[in-house]
Amino acid sequence: MADRRRQRASQDTEDEESGASGSDSGGSPARGGGSCSGSVGGGGSGSLPSQRGGRAGALHLRRVESGGAKSAEESECESEDGIEGDAVLSDYESAEDSEGDDGEYSEEENSKVELKSEANDAANSSAKDEKGEEKPDTKGTVTGERQSGDGQESTEPVENKVGKKGPKHLDDDEDRKNPAYIPRKGLFFEHDLRGQTQEEEVRPKGRQRKLWKDEGRWEHDKFREDEQAPKSRQELIALYGYDIRSAHNPDDIKPRRIRKPRFGSPPQRDPSWIGERPNKSHRHQGPGGTLPPRTFINRNAAGTGRMSAPRNYSRSGGFKEGRTGFRPAEAGGQHAGRSGETVKHETSYRSRHLEQTPVRDPSPEADAQVLGSPEKEEVAPEIPNPAPDTAPPVPDRPVEKKSYSRARRTRIKAGDAGKVAEEVPPPPEGLTPAPPVPEATPPTPAKTGNWEAPVDSTTGGLEQDVAQLNITEQNWSPGQPAFLQSRELRGMPNHIHMGAGPPPQFNRMEEMGVQGGRAKRYSSQRQRPVPEPPAPPVHISIMEGHYYDPLQFQGPIYTHGDSPAPLPPQGMIVQPEMHLPHPGLHPHQTPAPLPNPGLYPPPVSMSPGQPPPQQLLAPTYFSAPGVMNFGNPSYPYAPGALPPPPPPHLYPNTQAPSQVYGGVTYYNPAQQQVQPKPSPPRRTPQPVTIKPPPPEVVSRGSS
């Protein structure tokens, strides 16, 4: 538009200047354009005839100068027929293109003159020449003139307008080079292939030449039937280093299999590991008859060196180990063979962790390691020794192992006030009872040194009974609990052991009696209810239901009172803490435990859901252990666990380095307990409950 305006302005100046010269020379009709412009510029002073002549001149000028590019003058002259030029012109011009230049021309001559003077002066001569020229030249000139009609070009032939306008200027929507172009034929989208079948067919013809070669391009990935045929074992071994197809051949896949158990995955791989585990258990344990107990022992002895650490880990990781130990104990009982192997693997795995945990509870750890490794080492012997110990001890050990698994499930399940009472010692045995384990009764004293020594002093006949049980249970419960608890903490070990070792557990449980009846295979919780109606089953329930930690707590309580098995969990999980509360709580809780037998079962229900109950139970166990150590009454003492609730705080807080109570050495798992607390695991679910969004909402509301 700016170009058009400039062109128009230049034409106007040319016309007007030529018109002015014409008026000066006499305003001849030939120069009517000049006279017209002069009259208009003068405010209509020119005569009518002169105006008409000016009109004719204007028409001629329009043709000469370019029909489309009429000057403002011409338009004025045209519109003037006897009407005052200014008024008509101003209206006409405003209707024209609303071009400021034309409007100014129509309104005042001064503005016109100014604009014209601004235009090229050279146009004067050209304008004069053009006037003299004929119409034919108009077309040539018109090409450079306005291309869009504004209503003033009606006199010009439409042909010229269209002919010149079309080729000259394309609307934005018609110009293919313009982004605003609107396609009106064919496809509307450049890549729309719906109607381009022909083009597509044509294109390939042009593409016949290949710029690259495909030969050998897929050699690395070609399908070769000969390669798809099954490979021979030799080929597989050559390729992979072992027969990848023998899923059930442990020798071929030994490394992998071993790794998995270490990580506590054996439960899932029990079927494949069943063969291997028994072998390992045999390696560690010896007679197959004692395999189930030994299996547990293996857990204890599996990582003999590590085992001490595992036990410590149980104690150090009291709660975690409690859970792990709890179910694994059951699993251990059930898994005699399988679980044993798994336990071994997991034992080594946990022993690693436990080795770490020793740092957590150095003094307990040292004791635990000292006691634990011997116990582990001797747990295997002890299982064989149960026969030497006495016929009952052998079953007792299995029973106690079961009892321990019970202890995991139901600490009280030890079934067994006596067992539980002696069981208190087993945890230390877990720490260092193993050596005594080889000897049924003597091991008991040895264990007693750790756990049962007081028991011996406290309970003469019971202690021997429990001592045997302790030996058995200590072997399986202390060491195994640590692993089992650890495993259960990990979650996989418990289930694995439970899945793998349910039958063995039943063996132990059978030995234990009612305990054997419980399905220790799956959730310890299931077996909690099943656990013997007596407090011990409740204990198991508490321990199992609550956390594995509660089991540990309960285990310790029962350990003191009921049997060594429960205590190992305590020792593993809460032993240190228990030790502190135990000595302190013993006196205080001794009376309470008896009144609280009923309470003990309630804690069971509570403990499953709450870590605090575990602590309460654990304290109860502490006090109960003291009482239990004195005698079988530990059952009531186990209930006494409820009164010990405060002790939980005491024992965690007290964190006595290690105390020997009733012949039971209590280590300070308070530190370990804090670390292994299963609360964190539960907290993991809690975060779901505690959802961060609510805090966000609160912050939003506050903000």
Swiss-Prot record:
Regions of compositional bias (Polar residues) in chain numbering? 140-157
SMART domains, per database record: Btz (SM01044)
The short motif Nuclear localization signal 1 is annotated over: 204-210
Q: Report whether Aminoacyl-tRNA synthetase shows up as a keyword of the record.
A: no
Q: Which GO terms of type biological process are on file?
A: intracellular mRNA localization; mRNA splicing, via spliceosome; mRNA transport; nuclear-transcribed mRNA catabolic process, nonsense-mediated decay; regulation of nuclear-transcribed mRNA catabolic process, nonsense-mediated decay; regulation of translation
Motif residue range(s): Nuclear export signal:
462-471
Composition skew (Low complexity), residue ranges: 19-28, 47-59
Residue span of region Disordered: 1-451, 633-703
Chain intervals for the UniProt region annotation (Necessary for RNA-binding, interaction with MAGOH and localization in nucleus speckles)? 137-283
The record's subcellular locations are: Cytoplasm; Cytoplasm, Perinuclear region; Nucleus; Nucleus speckle
**Annotated coiled-coil segments of the chain:** 102-125
Against Pfam families, the record matches this protein to: Btz (PF09405)
Please name the GO terms that the record assigns under molecular function: identical protein binding; mRNA binding; ubiquitin protein ligase binding
Q: Where is the composition biased (Pro residues)?
A: 383-396, 424-445, 641-650, 677-696
Q: Is the keyword DNA-binding in the record?
A: no
Question: Residue ranges under compositional bias (Gly residues)?
Answer: 29-46
Q: Where is this region: Sufficient to form the EJC?
A: 137-283
Q: Where is the composition biased (Basic and acidic residues)?
A: 109-119, 127-138, 158-178, 211-234, 245-255, 341-355, 413-422
Q: Which residues carry this modification: Phosphoserine?
A: 35, 117, 148, 265, 363, 373, 477
Main role? Required for pre-mRNA splicing as component of the spliceosome. Core component of the splicing-dependent multiprotein exon junction complex (EJC) deposited at splice junctions on mRNAs. The EJC is a dynamic structure consisting of core proteins and several peripheral nuclear and cytoplasmic associated factors that join the complex only transiently either during EJC assembly or during subsequent mRNA metabolism.
Record remark: domains: The coiled coil domain may be involved in oligomerization.
Spell out the family assignment given in the record's similarity comment: Belongs to the CASC3 family.
Binding partners and assembly? Identified in the spliceosome C complex. Component of the mRNA splicing-dependent exon junction complex (EJC), which contains at least CASC3, EIF4A3, MAGOH, NXF1 and RBM8A/Y14. Identified in a complex composed of the EJC core, UPF3B and UPF2. The EJC core can also interact with UPF3A (in vitro). Forms homooligomers. Interacts with STAU in an RNA-dependent manner. Interacts with DHX34; the interaction is RNA-independent.
- What is the protein name stated in its UniProt record? Protein CASC3
The organism named in the record is Bos taurus (Bovine)
